[in-house]
């Protein structure tokens, strides 16, 4: 894909829904290019949460194109996800009033737990919504809606799986792919982290370091949002036709419910 602009050539990056590219110039310089990404990228870069934004422009076909610095490093693995740097980045994100204000001005609405369930129901593929096990999970979630205070809502990333974290060769860690950003309870991100990557015996330390109290109220909310995080991943993998990870997430959700369901 050649834009004919400053001789920038775009090469699609596999696995990014056709919206991400490696941009290259004749002199060998490389950049990361994303189509129709979140307009809050400059703010995220200022907070050192996301890579630096180099430029953005509107294409003739109406799409927005943003360029970020090309990072030399690696994508984190599940075994990397217990680092304190990651907790610090999430804390910085969730406590950022400027980013939350910017999202509000862009028209993002506050989402309650009920809204989150409704959003999943409206966007999930029919095959998932009709699945007996998933229908059972959704019914349980509707019966156990956690408390929610709008004045405690924060900006959340919405998809903190390990493949959305990048560590540079210099040791900096960035959170990328902001297509799922929303305004809701910070537990949306926290529960995904804990139920997918952090051993139960480390939950108290992790939550305390983040800033939570470790009590039954928090654990009940963790159980609710943890299930929602599995449903979210199942839906995303299914829509990308990644059935191996769909099955892995369903297995994880079954195990999570079997292990923690009686402790609510």
UniProtKB/Swiss-Prot annotation:
GO MF, any single term: phosphotransferase activity, alcohol group as acceptor
Localization per record: Cytoplasm
GO biological process, one term: cell division
Disruption phenotype: Dramatic reduction of growth rate and loss of nucleoid. Slight decrease in cell length and cell area. Cells form multiple, often incomplete, septa, and FtsZ and Z-rings are mislocalized, with the presence of several aberrant Z-rings in 43% of the cells. Cells have defective DNA content and they have either no DNA at all or chromosomes are cut during septum closure. In many cells, the chromosome is localized at only one half of the cell.
A Pfam family annotated for this UniProt entry: APH
GO cellular component: cell division site; cytoplasm
InterPro entries noted in UniProt: Aminoglycoside_PTrfase (IPR002575), CcrZ_PhaseVar_Mediator (IPR052077), Kinase-like_dom_sf (IPR011009)
Keyword GTP-binding: no
Keyword Iron-sulfur attached: no
Keywords assigned: ATP-binding, Cell cycle, Cell division, Cytoplasm, DNA damage, DNA replication, Kinase, Nucleotide-binding, Transferase
EC number of the protein: 2.7.1.15, 2.7.1.229
Disulfide bonds, paired cysteine numbers: none
Oligomer status and interactors: Monomer in solution. Interacts with DnaA (via domains I (1-82) and III (111-326)). Interacts with DnaB. Interacts with FtsZ; the interaction is direct and ensures correct localization during the cell cycle.
PANTHER family for this protein: CELL CYCLE REGULATOR CCRZ (PTHR40086:SF1), PHOSPHOTRANSFERASE YTMP-RELATED (PTHR40086)
Purpose: Plays a role in cell cycle regulation and chromosome integrity. Activates DnaA-dependent chromosomal DNA replication initiation ensuring that the chromosome is replicated at the right time during the cell cycle. May regulate replication initiation through phosphorylation of a possible second messenger or metabolite, and by interacting with replication initiation proteins. Has ATPase activity with D-ribose and 2-deoxy-D-ribose in vitro, but not with choline. Involved in DNA damage response.
Family (UniProt): Belongs to the aminoglycoside phosphotransferase family.
Name of protein: Cell cycle regulator CcrZ
Top-level taxonomy: Bacteria, Bacillati, Bacillota, Bacilli, Lactobacillales
């Amino acid at each position: 894909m050649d834009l004919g602009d400053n001789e920038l050539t775009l090469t699609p990056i596999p696995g990014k829904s056709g919206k991400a590219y490696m941009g290259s110039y004749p002199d060998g310089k490389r950049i990361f290019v994303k189509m129709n990404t979140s307009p809050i990228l400059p703010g995220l870069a200022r907070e050192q949460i996301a890579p630096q934004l180099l430029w953005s422009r509107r294409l003739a076909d109406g799409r927005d194109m943003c360029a970020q610095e090309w990072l030399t490093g690696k994508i984190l693995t599940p075994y990397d996800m217990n680092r304190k740097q990651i907790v610090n980045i999430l804390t910085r994100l969730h406590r950022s009033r400027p980013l939350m204000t910017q999202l509000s001005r862009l028209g993002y609405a506050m989402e309650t737990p009920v809204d989150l369930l409704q959003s999943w129901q409206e966007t999930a593929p029919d095959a998932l919504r009709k699945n007996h096990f998933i229908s059972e999970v959704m019914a349980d979630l509707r019966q156990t809606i956690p408390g929610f205070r709008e004045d405690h809502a924060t900006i959340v990333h919405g998809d903190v799986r390990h493949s959305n974290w990048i560590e540079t060769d210099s040791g900096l860690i960035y959170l990328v792919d902001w297509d799922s950003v929303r305004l809701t309870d910070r537990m949306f991100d926290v529960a995904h982290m804990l139920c997918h990557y952090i051993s139960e015996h480390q939950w108290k330390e992790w939550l305390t370091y983040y800033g939570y109290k470790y009590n039954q109220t928090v654990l009940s909310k963790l159980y609710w949002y943890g299930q929602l995080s599995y449903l979210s991943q199942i839906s995303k993998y299914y829509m990308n036709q990644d059935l191996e990870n769909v099955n892995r997430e369903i297995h994880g959700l079954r195990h999570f419910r079997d292990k923690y369901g009686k402790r609510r």
